[in-house]
Every structure is written in C-alpha cells, then in structure tokens.
Regions:
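Intrinsically disordered or compositionally simple regulatory linkers and C-terminal tails
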Residues: 1-2, 171-190
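A generic structural signal for short hydrophobic patches within well-formed alpha-helices
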Residues: 18, 70, 106, 139-140
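A short beta-strand->alpha-helix segment at the C-terminal rim
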Residues: 84-90, 97-105, 126-164
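Short amphipathic alpha-helices in soluble, non-transmembrane regions
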Residues: 73-79
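Short amphipathic alpha-helical segments
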Residues: 121-125
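Catalytic NTP-binding/metal-coordinating core of nucleotidyl cyclase/transferase enzymes
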Residues: 2-73
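Catalytic core of nucleotidyl cyclases, primarily class III adenylyl/guanylyl cyclases
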Residues: 44-71, 84-118
Length: 190
C-alpha cells in the first residue's frame, strides 16, 4: 500500500557517456565496467546510511534520511569513480558522473519511491555537467552550517513538470575547487 514518508534526500547518479562506452568497448566490456561503477555508487550510498531504491542501467536512485549523508555519499561516489583507470580510447578519458539531490516528501510503494521530490532530483541530473553535484535550496537548508562551505548558488530555473522556478546550487567536492570557493562561502543561509 502506498505510503507518504517524511522528508528524504533523494539522490540520482548517472554515469556520463555510457552509450559511448558501449560503442568504444563493446557490449560485454562496457556492461562489466558500468556494473562495477554502479557497485561503487551503491557502496558509497550504503556507507553513508543511504537506501538503494533501484539501479537502472547506468543510473542509481537512493534516498537518505539526512541531507548531510546524501551529500557525503555524492562526494564519495565521485571520488570512488575517479580512482578507476581512464579509458584508453580516443575521445574518452576518465569515467565521470552526473549527480542531483533534492529533499522532500515521497510516496513509497513496493520498494520504489515516487513524487515531486523524485522528479526534481531526476531533473537536476539532466541539468548537471560531468563531475558536478547539483542540489536544491531544500538540501542546502537541511545541511549543517559546517557543511555549507563548499556550496555555491548557481541559478534559478524552470524544470519540466514544475510551474515555478527552483533554485539550483552546486556542491563543490574537489579539494582544489573547494579552496577557491571557500574564499567566498555561501553566507545567505548561515
């Protein structure tokens, strides 16, 4: 029976250029690599108290009771995939991810989750660039103040299925970029 939850942090992660991997490596090798990546993503989510809802090909959907755990898992996902050896094919390099996180109520039904919060998290993945973690204002507000230092406001945008704009932020996870951003931290929400 469908059941509404309290607010959860919904995280989508998608492996960048996976279609190109199949062309470059062939079906078997590409599928093996993608499965290895999805395993790394799952481990990162579980390490930070996440619940794996499902994996869909080159994508993972998980949720977290705490937004701080979701952001920590997203950073770990990028770092884990970043340790994989680069693909030695022209036009490719390292495996990268697109990650989006939104916080809100969802409907749980049959082990899956549905609702506006899930849709917004999925839209963030579509908006993100490789190696980015995009989050919404709801996630920023749920973070502990000490975890907001690497957050940068990007823009407001209308996403498919929403009548009003959402505020999009980037969570900077790479140390060299974090050093730059911390010189002008997000102060609007502290």
């Amino acid at each position: 029976m469908p059941e509404e939850t309290g607010p959860l942090a919904i995280l989508f992660a998608d492996i960048a250029k996976s279609t190109q991997l199949y062309e470059l490596l062939g079906d078997e090798e590409a599928q093996s690599l993608i499965a290895s990546c999805v395993t790394l993503l799952s481990k990162a989510a579980l390490q930070h108290r996440g619940t794996i809802i499902k994996t869909i090909g080159d994508e993972i959907l998980c949720n977290f009771v705490d937004a701080n755990d979701a952001v920590a898992a997203a950073k770990l996902m990028h770092r884990a995939v970043g340790k994989l050896p680069p693909i030695n094919k022209p036009g490719f390099g390292s495996i990268n991810l697109y990650i989006g996180i939104h916080m809100g109520h969802v409907i749980e039904d049959g082990g899956d989750i549905f609702g506006d919060a899930v849709n917004i998290a999925a839209r963030l993945v579509e908006l993100s660039k490789q190696r980015q973690i995009l989050i919404t204002e709801q996630v920023v507000e749920a973070l502990y103040p000490e975890n907001r230092g690497g957050i940068q406001s990007l823009y407001e945008t209308i996403v498919k299925g929403k009548s009003g704009p959402i505020s999009v932020y980037e969570c900077i996870w790479e140390e060299e970029a974090l050093t730059i951003i911390e010189k002008s931290p997000l102060s609007a929400l502290t």
